[in-house]
């Protein structure tokens, strides 16, 4: 069975921090690096993941990969200097894959994951699928990358529209 192998991965990947009798963590991907974030103030472990989507899915330019890694390492240092507990999952670690990561989190006893809206359909589907399989609750927070909030766009992109035009949205 793989569960014995999984235990070894889990121990090296995450530490347990209990918050309100719930084991919670903040999951941060390479496109979600923010200096000011409400996630940093909740007292949870921050897990920075060099996810396969951003590092392995395609043959990315080496400078792009170096930039992602340097940015993530910089955020790790920044958070540690603020006294926030951080775990860093390298793209070389098996847990950089959504399935393995969520299995590891479940095996370690985590039940609640805070993260930003992934803004990537593939990553969103993977996270939704694996969270259901592993029994993890994901709490999505508004992504600061965007001016509009998701609920603000519901009126415009409702089911009543048959066609979408750039001019109608921006003018």
Could you describe each region identified by the protein language model?
Residues 71-74, 97-101:
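Well-ordered alpha-helical segments embedded in enzymatic catalytic cores
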Residues 91-97:
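Acidic-and-aromatic substrate-binding clefts and catalytic sites of carbohydrate-active enzymes
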Residues 9-91:
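N-terminal beta-strand-loop-alpha-helix module at the start
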Residues 34, 54, 94, 121, ...:
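Surface-exposed, flexible loop/turn segments at secondary-structure boundaries
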Residues 10, 98-171:
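Beta-rich, aromatic/charged-enriched effector core domains that present basic-aromatic interfaces
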């Amino acid at each position: 069975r793989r569960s014995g192998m999984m235990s070894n991965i889990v121990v090296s990947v995450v530490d347990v921090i209990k918050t309100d009798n719930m084991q919670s963590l903040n999951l941060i991907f390479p496109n979600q690096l923010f200096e000011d974030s409400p996630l940093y103030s909740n007292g949870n472990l921050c897990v920075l993941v060099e996810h396969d989507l951003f590092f392995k899915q395609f043959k990315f330019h080496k400078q792009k990969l170096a930039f992602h890694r340097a940015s993530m390492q910089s955020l790790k240092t920044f958070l540690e200097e603020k006294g926030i507990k951080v775990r860093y999952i390298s793209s070389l670690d098996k847990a950089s894959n959504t399935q393995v990561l969520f299995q590891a989190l479940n095996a370690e006893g985590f039940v609640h994951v805070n993260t930003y809206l992934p803004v990537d359909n593939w990553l969103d589907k993977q996270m939704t699928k694996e969270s259901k399989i592993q029994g993890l609750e994901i709490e999505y927070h508004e992504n600061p990358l965007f001016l509009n909030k998701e609920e603000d766009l519901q009126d415009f992109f409702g089911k009543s529209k048959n066609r979408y035009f750039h001019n109608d949205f921006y003018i």
